[in-house]
């Protein structure tokens, strides 16, 4: 038991000092072609993380437009757009080309696009996503949000559980 406790103490100290990060681009050499290209897109065109929101297509244009307005008020959201927020409730979508409708409304869902000023993998964007998910679920309990920010947030949550489980089992094995 004494040996176990002596070995356990360094494990606990090391674990508490280990910083886990998920901004993978920051950990790579900044002169890599992909990193340079991504940085250039951000600088030249203001490219920011985009959130792709899917809500059921039985929501009215007014409901979707109202949701877009609420999402615009979330800290760090720079713009929100959907077919309904552009056309309004009285617009006949049959006038639009099928190719446009396949992107914006198909498979039983409507697409909403929201851009964020926050960097992916940070506490700020994770908090932003939590607020957005709350707003979306108020309108459509089965609505979903995806994109780089949401997927990284999911990765963080899953990896955190995995790391904790591996640590516990590793300590127990020792």
Predicted regions mapped to residue ranges:
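Signature of alpha-helical transmembrane segments and their immediate interfacial
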Residues: 1-23
């Amino acid at each position: 038991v004494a040996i176990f406790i002596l070995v356990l103490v360094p494990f606990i100290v090391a674990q508490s000092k280990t910083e886990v990060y998920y901004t993978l681009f920051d950990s790579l050499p900044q002169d890599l072609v992909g990193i340079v290209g991504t940085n250039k897109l951000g600088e030249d065109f203001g490219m920011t993380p985009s959130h792709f929101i899917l809500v059921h297509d039985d929501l009215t244009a007014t409901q979707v437009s109202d949701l877009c307005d609420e999402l615009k008020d979330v800290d760090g959201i720079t713009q929100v757009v959907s077919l309904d927020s552009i056309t309004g409730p009285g617009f006949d979508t049959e006038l639009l080309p099928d190719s446009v409708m396949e992107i914006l409304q198909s498979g039983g869902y409507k697409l909403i696009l929201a851009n964020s000023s926050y960097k992916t993998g940070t506490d700020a964007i994770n908090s932003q996503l939590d607020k957005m998910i709350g707003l979306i679920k108020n309108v459509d309990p089965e609505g979903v949000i995806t994109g780089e920010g949401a997927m990284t947030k999911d990765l963080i949550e899953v990896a955190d559980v995995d790391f904790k489980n591996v640590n516990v089992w590793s300590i127990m094995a020792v």
